[in-house]
């Protein structure tokens, strides 16, 4: 098994793609990475960073969210079939926000481009619940790291 260097390379970035159009929260040299699972994503993002160290890797995630996991699974069962080449998340907005924050905190990717699989309410939930939850999680993680560093410097 290969070793991969994983570490966040900057602030978390999030975008939403609808068809051939994408909205991203920050400009920059961003490259979208597609993989069916986290292992493949880790490999592809590591290879990208080795080839092009100044770009930011954003993982594409097919998304089906609802207010509860049962409703999200039911909506996914009724959705058209997918090609299976993109990471898939089916669940709640908070769960999706946690996945995005974890992918960034572990240094697997610099963020995500969310691809809504259902239009009925999915885009609204991404805008109204996922994005604010991601901002809160990243803010809490940053504050915790700063608090820990401050405490360590006082004891040194």
Stretches found by the model and what they are:
Residues 1-156:
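Active-site-adjacent structural elements that line small-molecule/cofactor binding pockets in enzymes
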């Amino acid at each position: 098994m290969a070793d991969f260097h994983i570490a966040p390379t900057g602030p978390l970035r999030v975008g939403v793609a609808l068809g051939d159009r994408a909205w991203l929260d920050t400009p920059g040299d961003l490259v979208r990475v597609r993989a069916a699972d986290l292992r493949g994503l880790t490999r592809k993002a590591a290879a990208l960073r080795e080839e092009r160290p100044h770009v930011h890797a954003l993982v594409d995630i097919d998304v089906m969210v609802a207010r509860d996991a049962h409703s999200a699974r039911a909506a996914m069962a009724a959705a058209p079939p997918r090609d299976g080449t993109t990471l898939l998340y089916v669940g709640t907005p908070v769960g999706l926000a946690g996945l995005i924050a974890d992918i960034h905190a572990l240094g697997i990717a610099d963020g995500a481009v969310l691809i809504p699989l259902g239009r009925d309410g999915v885009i609204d939930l991404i805008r109204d619940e996922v994005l604010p939850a991601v901002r809160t999680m990243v803010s809490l993680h940053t504050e915790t790291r700063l608090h820990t560093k401050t405490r360590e410097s006082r004891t040194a």
